[in-house]
């Protein structure tokens, strides 16, 4: 009914609008089930899995590959590891891609955060953050950005120490490896 009331310029615009409405409905269902934060985190983790598994990502993005086979493969990867909403959203991304699997899944994670009134900060640290560090960082970022923050964390030992924080296109590099690189650049 909602889609019928909309004004669509092209069939492609209508398709995109319907896909967006379907994704929003699934996220609202997760919200009503009290699972929206979990779905957001699962989608983020899936985007990171796809980044770390380029063969899987390339296969899922391959327009010439059988769509049913791609969905079956992803369903096997996700089965029993994520909520039903996360699985449905991920399978829909593969069936109706807008850009590529990684970007589409990541965009859904950010959209889930936005539905909760949050901005996303991706925090890559040399070691896993403690709960206290997580809370302190979230509070500081909320002060900077004037929004509640969803912290999506990942560990990268190559940073040696510290962390890199990404909020949208802004990057705050407080990592030891980043500081060393900046010092090297100054010496040259």
Model feature map: region roles:
Residues 1-164, 170, 175-188:
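Elongated, mostly alpha-helical coiled-coil "stalk/stator" tethers of large membrane protein machines
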């Amino acid at each position: 009914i909602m889609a019928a009331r909309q004004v669509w310029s092209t069939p492609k615009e209508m398709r995109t609008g319907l896909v967006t409405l379907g994704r929003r409905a699934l996220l609202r269902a997760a919200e009503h089930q009290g699972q929206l934060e979990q779905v957001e985190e699962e989608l983020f983790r899936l985007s990171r899995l796809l980044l770390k598994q380029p063969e899987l990502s390339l296969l899922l993005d391959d327009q010439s590959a059988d769509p049913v086979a791609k969905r079956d493969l992803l369903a096997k990867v996700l089965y029993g590891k994520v909520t039903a909403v996360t699985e449905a959203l991920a399978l829909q991304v593969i069936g109706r891609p807008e850009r590529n699997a990684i970007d589409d899944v990541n965009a859904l994670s950010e959209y889930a955060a936005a539905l909760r009134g949050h901005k996303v900060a991706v925090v890559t640290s040399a070691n896993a953050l403690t709960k206290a560090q997580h809370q302190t960082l979230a509070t500081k970022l909320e002060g900077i950005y004037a929004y509640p923050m969803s912290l999506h964390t990942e560990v990268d030992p190559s940073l040696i120490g510290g962390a890199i924080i990404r909020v949208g296109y802004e990057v705050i590099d407080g990592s030891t490896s980043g500081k060393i690189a900046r010092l090297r650049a100054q010496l040259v």
